[in-house]
């Protein structure tokens, strides 16, 4: 992909763990590579399809100096986060933050951290069977947007019977396709935080819930950890999930089963 490179932007700020760093301040140096499609900007002279690197450098300087953080990891992360927020056309970003005056009392050129993130497509299943179900789904989607997660597509809301054998009210279910620069684990933690904010209490496994947010796919990632399994292990067994998926992404290929969603839906429906 096309790349914009900004190298060694110098800024003076008051980041650091030691009191002297927060009182006296020091120099920091930022370099970054931003990846996005430059075709439209290059061929049509369309400035809206480009990143104004002068304005970006000014924004970085302002953002960098408006707080005093203990760790340079925090500052670097915030620069990446806000760059993605202000420049939606950026698809990938690699940022290095150097701290040449780091108080290590030894001879060195610099200390630095590098953060590398890229946007990914993900699919999230939403469900609710308590209170105003459709309003709960809408609130969850609004909270995703508020966290900088771009909603690409929304399926219709389906009324479905509960899954898992626990007697309870019917569900309102939906699937959304999103674009986010958050890694899969961070995206999962975001979903859990939204559930908590909306009042979900985990008491009965597969029991009633005010809101349920399940991470189905993140691109074609295959992942197995104590906290997260990708793809979601029950996709091929849940007709309501497949029905919503095939509405918005019928040709998406399940990375383990190697079949498009449309085929999985047709097979389970029979």
UniProtKB/Swiss-Prot annotation:
<feature type="binding site">
    <location>
        <begin position="238"/>
        <end position="240"/>
    </location>
    <ligand>
        <name>ATP</name>
    </ligand>
</feature>
<dbReference type="InterPro" id="IPR006157">
    <property type="entry name" value="FolB_dom"/>
</dbReference>
<keyword id="KW-0460">Magnesium</keyword>
<dbReference type="InterPro" id="IPR000550">
    <property type="entry name" value="Hppk"/>
</dbReference>
<comment type="similarity">
    <text>In the C-terminal section; belongs to the HPPK family.</text>
</comment>
<dbReference type="GO" id="GO:0046654">
    <property type="term" value="P:tetrahydrofolate biosynthetic process"/>
</dbReference>
<dbReference type="Pfam" id="PF02152">
    <property type="entry name" value="FolB"/>
</dbReference>
<keyword id="KW-0067">ATP-binding</keyword>
<keyword id="KW-0808">Transferase</keyword>
<comment type="similarity">
    <text>In the N-terminal section; belongs to the DHNA family.</text>
</comment>
<keyword id="KW-0456">Lyase</keyword>
<dbReference type="GO" id="GO:0046872">
    <property type="term" value="F:metal ion binding"/>
</dbReference>
<feature type="binding site">
    <location>
        <position position="212"/>
    </location>
    <ligand>
        <name>Mg(2+) 2</name>
    </ligand>
</feature>
<feature type="binding site">
    <location>
        <position position="214"/>
    </location>
    <ligand>
        <name>Mg(2+) 1</name>
    </ligand>
</feature>
<feature type="binding site">
    <location>
        <position position="21"/>
    </location>
    <ligand>
        <name>substrate</name>
    </ligand>
</feature>
<dbReference type="GO" id="GO:0046656">
    <property type="term" value="P:folic acid biosynthetic process"/>
</dbReference>
<dbReference type="GO" id="GO:0016301">
    <property type="term" value="F:kinase activity"/>
</dbReference>
<keyword id="KW-0418">Kinase</keyword>
<dbReference type="GO" id="GO:0004150">
    <property type="term" value="F:dihydroneopterin aldolase activity"/>
</dbReference>
<keyword id="KW-0289">Folate biosynthesis</keyword>
<feature type="binding site">
    <location>
        <begin position="171"/>
        <end position="173"/>
    </location>
    <ligand>
        <name>ATP</name>
    </ligand>
</feature>
<feature type="region of interest" description="HPPK">
    <location>
        <begin position="120"/>
        <end position="270"/>
    </location>
</feature>
<dbReference type="InterPro" id="IPR035907">
    <property type="entry name" value="Hppk_sf"/>
</dbReference>
<feature type="binding site">
    <location>
        <begin position="160"/>
        <end position="163"/>
    </location>
    <ligand>
        <name>ATP</name>
    </ligand>
</feature>
<comment type="pathway">
    <text>Cofactor biosynthesis; tetrahydrofolate biosynthesis; 2-amino-4-hydroxy-6-hydroxymethyl-7,8-dihydropteridine diphosphate from 7,8-dihydroneopterin triphosphate: step 4/4.</text>
</comment>
<feature type="binding site">
    <location>
        <begin position="227"/>
        <end position="233"/>
    </location>
    <ligand>
        <name>ATP</name>
    </ligand>
</feature>
<feature type="binding site">
    <location>
        <begin position="200"/>
        <end position="215"/>
    </location>
    <ligand>
        <name>ATP</name>
    </ligand>
</feature>
<keyword id="KW-0511">Multifunctional enzyme</keyword>
<feature type="active site" description="Proton donor/acceptor; for DHNA activity">
    <location>
        <position position="99"/>
    </location>
</feature>
<keyword id="KW-0547">Nucleotide-binding</keyword>
<feature type="binding site">
    <location>
        <position position="53"/>
    </location>
    <ligand>
        <name>substrate</name>
    </ligand>
</feature>
<dbReference type="GO" id="GO:0005524">
    <property type="term" value="F:ATP binding"/>
</dbReference>
<dbReference type="Pfam" id="PF01288">
    <property type="entry name" value="HPPK"/>
</dbReference>
<dbReference type="GO" id="GO:0003848">
    <property type="term" value="F:2-amino-4-hydroxy-6-hydroxymethyldihydropteridine diphosphokinase activity"/>
</dbReference>
<feature type="binding site">
    <location>
        <begin position="72"/>
        <end position="73"/>
    </location>
    <ligand>
        <name>substrate</name>
    </ligand>
</feature>
<dbReference type="InterPro" id="IPR006156">
    <property type="entry name" value="Dihydroneopterin_aldolase"/>
</dbReference>
<feature type="binding site">
    <location>
        <position position="212"/>
    </location>
    <ligand>
        <name>Mg(2+) 1</name>
    </ligand>
</feature>
<comment type="subunit">
    <text>Homotrimer or homotetramer.</text>
</comment>
<dbReference type="InterPro" id="IPR043133">
    <property type="entry name" value="GTP-CH-I_C/QueF"/>
</dbReference>
<keyword id="KW-0479">Metal-binding</keyword>
<protein>
    <recommendedName>
        <fullName>Bifunctional folate synthesis protein</fullName>
        <ecNumber>4.1.2.25</ecNumber>
        <ecNumber>2.7.6.3</ecNumber>
    </recommendedName>
</protein>
<comment type="pathway">
    <text>Cofactor biosynthesis; tetrahydrofolate biosynthesis; 2-amino-4-hydroxy-6-hydroxymethyl-7,8-dihydropteridine diphosphate from 7,8-dihydroneopterin triphosphate: step 3/4.</text>
</comment>
């Amino acid at each position: 992909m096309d790349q914009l490179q900004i190298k060694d932007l110098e800024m003076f700020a008051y980041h650091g763990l030691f009191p002297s760093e927060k009182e006296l301040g020091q120099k920091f140096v930022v370099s970054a590579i931003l990846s996005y499609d430059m075709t439209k900007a290059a061929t049509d002279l369309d400035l809206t399809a480009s990143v104004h690197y002068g304005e970006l450098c000014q924004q970085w300087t302002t953002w960098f100096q408006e707080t005093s953080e203990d760790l340079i990891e925090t500052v670097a992360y915030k620069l990446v986060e806000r760059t993605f927020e202000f420049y939606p056309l950026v698809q990938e970003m690699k940022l290095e933050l150097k701290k040449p005056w780091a108080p290590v009392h030894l001879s060195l050129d610099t200390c630095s951290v590098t953060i590398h993130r890229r946007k990914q497509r993900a699919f999230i299943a939403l469900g609710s069977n308590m209170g105003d179900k459709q309003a709960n789904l809408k609130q969850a989607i609004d909270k995703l947007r508020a966290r900088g997660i771009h909603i690409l597509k929304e399926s219709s809301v389906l009324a479905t019977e509960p899954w898992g054998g626990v007697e309870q009210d019917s569900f309102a279910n939906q699937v959304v396709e999103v674009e986010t620069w958050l890694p899969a684990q961070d995206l999962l933690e975001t979903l859990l935080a939204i559930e908590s904010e909306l009042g979900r209490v985990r008491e009965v496994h597969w029991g009633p819930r005010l809101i349920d947010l399940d991470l189905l796919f993140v691109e074609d990632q295959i992942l197995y950890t104590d906290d997260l399994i990708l793809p979601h292990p029950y996709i091929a067994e849940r007709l309501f999930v497949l029905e919503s998926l095939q509405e918005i992404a019928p040709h998406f290929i399940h990375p383990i089963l190697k079949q498009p969603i449309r085929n999985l839906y047709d097979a389970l429906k029979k």
